Amino acid sequence: MQNLKISKKLLVMFLVTALIPMLVLAFVSYNQSKTALIEKTNEKMFIYGSTNYNRIEQYFQSKLENGWVLSQTARIINAVDTYNQYGENSTEWKEIYKDLEFLNSYVEKFNLDSIYLIDKNGKSIFATGPNRAKIEGADFSGRDYFKDSISGKQNISVFAYSDIIKMHYITVATPLEKNGKYIGTVNMYLPVPQIQEMIQDGIEVIGKTGDVYLIDSEGLLYTNTKLGEFSQNAAFEKSIKTKAVELLSPEIKTGNLDFTFSGLYKDYRGNTVVGNLSVI
């Protein structure tokens, strides 16, 4: 988004002319310049938006592929199957549990926060990372991403707050299958700060007043903004109410990925901006 603060400068340019020509020329020039600025800004935003969208799409596609790789790993399938058969107190499970430490290498390789395994009933039976103690033994049966995954559908969760790990998260859930039956899921917590940074990377190409941020259907910020009072400690804490939110809200709720809008509106700082809106 780029502020429109050009009218004063253009009007001053015509003070040396007669009154009527000044008003007419200033009006025409201002509107022509405004139109040109909008077109130029929209062009920059389109290029940036397309590049950014492709980058985000490629990132999540790579994580889906990472999840698929894990779901095809025999040691993981065998571990979950053993847990389902013998239970957590069995000698068989205790031996395999130790072997699952190899998943730490995949956390590093795939650049994840954590990998965790869930049995067929929704109980987490193994996890990596600093939140391991919170995740293991926790009940995930009510999570939509688990319900979809245990039904055979690989999926990416929405941004949400977890009462288990006490932070906002996004996860990739992939079903584990053996002999034609879904026996559990392998799940990956993605690094939320990295996703937030990726969304805003390169916004400077639009201009010094360029801004980009992610919101939900109620205007809750999923990222900090680049400018203003919401540039720090605002993600998942602050909401905005703008024309952009009004336009996006119903489209987000219906999942209309084809929706786009380009035009003028007042942003969260009260400034008139050229904005480009889309649903991802």
Enumerate the predicted regions with their spans.
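Regulatory sensory and allosteric helical modules in signal-transduction proteins
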Residues: 103-106, 120-127, 144-160, 234-238, ...
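PAS and PAS-like sensory/regulatory domains
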Residues: 167-169, 273
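Sensory input modules used in signal transduction
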Residues: 157-159, 173, 277
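Short glycine-/small-residue motifs
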Residues: 67, 127, 185
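Juxtamembrane extracytoplasmic/periplasmic/luminal helical "stalk" adjacent to the first N-terminal
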Residues: 6-92, 108-113, 155, 168
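Solvent-exposed, extracytoplasmic
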Residues: 51, 85, 91-111, 130-133, ...
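Short N-terminal helix-loop-first-beta-strand/juxtamembrane motif that initiates sensory/input modules
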Residues: 62-73, 104-124, 154, 201-222, ...
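Extracellular/periplasmic juxtamembrane segments that couple receptor/chemosensory ectodomains to their
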Residues: 176-184, 217-218, 228-280
